[in-house]
């Protein structure tokens, strides 16, 4: 791919190998169903593979003259939240930043859960599946992915009667929690 061609090529093998082009990035990304090897790696992190939704993919991408392998999810702006389980400590965004929304399978619901990143979300799903957590099972899950996305979440959260916050206990996580709780009386901190 030439430097003048500023497109992100997404090759989704599940959709007949058709390529989608997203402007303003020079990366190539290949999506496929989560591989057994990636499921085993997630299990090493304590995540139950049977709890992982189909929206989580095994991903290969090229960047900086290197091919990276990891897992990821798409966000609402078409970007990809990506982590290399062997080489990264936390997920990063490829292309456009945005929240990731996982709506409840029951349709419209009155509660949501907010997570800092998709690895926290996967841990929550694993704990729920194993019966170790008894919070709302039927709720929309929103993954913030980056503190820049806070304003987008604040708008989204106004639609819910109950907002469950699962944010880090870091100083940034505490500021996010306090900001959300000040703006939304329905917010409950579970960190």
Label every PLM stretch briefly.
Residues 2, 36-40, 148-151, 174:
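Generic alpha-helical secondary structure signal
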Residues 130-191:
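TOPRIM fold recognition
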Residues 3-97:
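Basic, glycine-enriched DNA-binding surface that flanks or lies within the catalytic cores of DNA
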Residues 62-156:
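Phosphate-handling DNA/RNA-contact segment within nucleic-acid enzymes
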Residues 42, 124, 165:
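Terminal peptide-recognition signature
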């Amino acid at each position: 791919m030439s430097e003048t061609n500023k497109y992100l090529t997404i090759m989704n093998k599940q959709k007949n190998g058709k390529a989608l082009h997203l402007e303003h990035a020079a990366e190539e990304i290949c999506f496929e169903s989560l591989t057994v090897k990636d499921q085993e790696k997630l299990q090493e992190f304590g995540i139950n593979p049977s709890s992982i939704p189909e929206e989580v993919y095994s991903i290969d991408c090229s960047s900086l003259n290197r091919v990276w392998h990891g897992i990821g999810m798409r966000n609402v702006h078409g970007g990809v939240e990506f982590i290399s389980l062997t080489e990264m400590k936390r997920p990063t965004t490829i292309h456009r930043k945005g929240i990731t929304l996982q709506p409840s399978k029951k349709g419209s619901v009155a509660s949501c859960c907010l997570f800092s990143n998709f690895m926290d979300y996967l841990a929550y799903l694993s704990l729920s599946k194993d019966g170790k957590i008894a919070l709302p099972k039927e709720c929309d899950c929103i993954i913030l992915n980056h503190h820049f996305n806070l304003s987008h979440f604040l708008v989204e959260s106004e639609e819910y009667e109950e907002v469950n916050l699962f944010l880090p206990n870091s100083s940034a996580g505490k500021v996010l929690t306090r900001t959300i709780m000040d703006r939304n009386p329905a917010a409950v901190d579970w960190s």
